[in-house]
Amino acid sequence: MPPHSLSALRQQKLRYLFRILDVNNSGRIDADDIQLFVAALAAGRNYPQDSLAFAALKRAYMYIWERLSKQIDLNKDRKVTADEWLAFFDAVVDDENFYRDFIRPIERTMVSLLDVDGDNKIRLVDYRMLARALKLSPDEVEQVFDVMDVNRNGVLAEEEAAAAIQQFFLSDDVDATGNWFFGDYRK
């Protein structure tokens, strides 16, 4: 595989996210992994699996998965390997439509999921729900939230959370707070 034009930092963050999404630790991400991830998110929100809320959550994540996997799954085996994952992000590193077409929908889904009470603010208690799916320890949850809460007001405004997600995927700045959105990417 040719060298990536992605920075070492972005490769590190993307490998970390790949490991998170490979919920069953098969070395590949497939629809089963996404469904397991959704189940963990739903459990964090106390959504019963037969609820409308669970169905909506699953629908949103499966939609993102279907869109991404069509682009990422190079050999069309309905599984995404780490090499395919990195090759995709490497190919779109300079694509100005990538943010609009792929990152923005992820931002909207994540922010709406985390904003439990609909006030356009994400609190530590809200972030803990995501942290359960990310398998973060309670200490990590507080550490990560504190890093992202730049103005130290105890909440992430919708814009702060969206900016953090964007930074996770697009920033080459080692000090960008969004690098931590999904946890300690250095693991």
Task: Describe these PLM feature segments.
Residues 1-15:
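Plant-biased recognition of short, low-complexity, intrinsically disordered N-terminal tails
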Residues 3-6, 23, 154:
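Generic alpha-helical structural element
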Residues 6-9, 57-60, 99-102:
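A generic short alpha-helical patch detector that favors 3-5-residue windows
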Residues 20-22, 26-97, 109:
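Acidic (E/D-rich), amphipathic helical modules within compact regulatory domains
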Residues 64-118, 124, 128-187:
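EF-hand and EF-hand-like Ca2+-sensor regions
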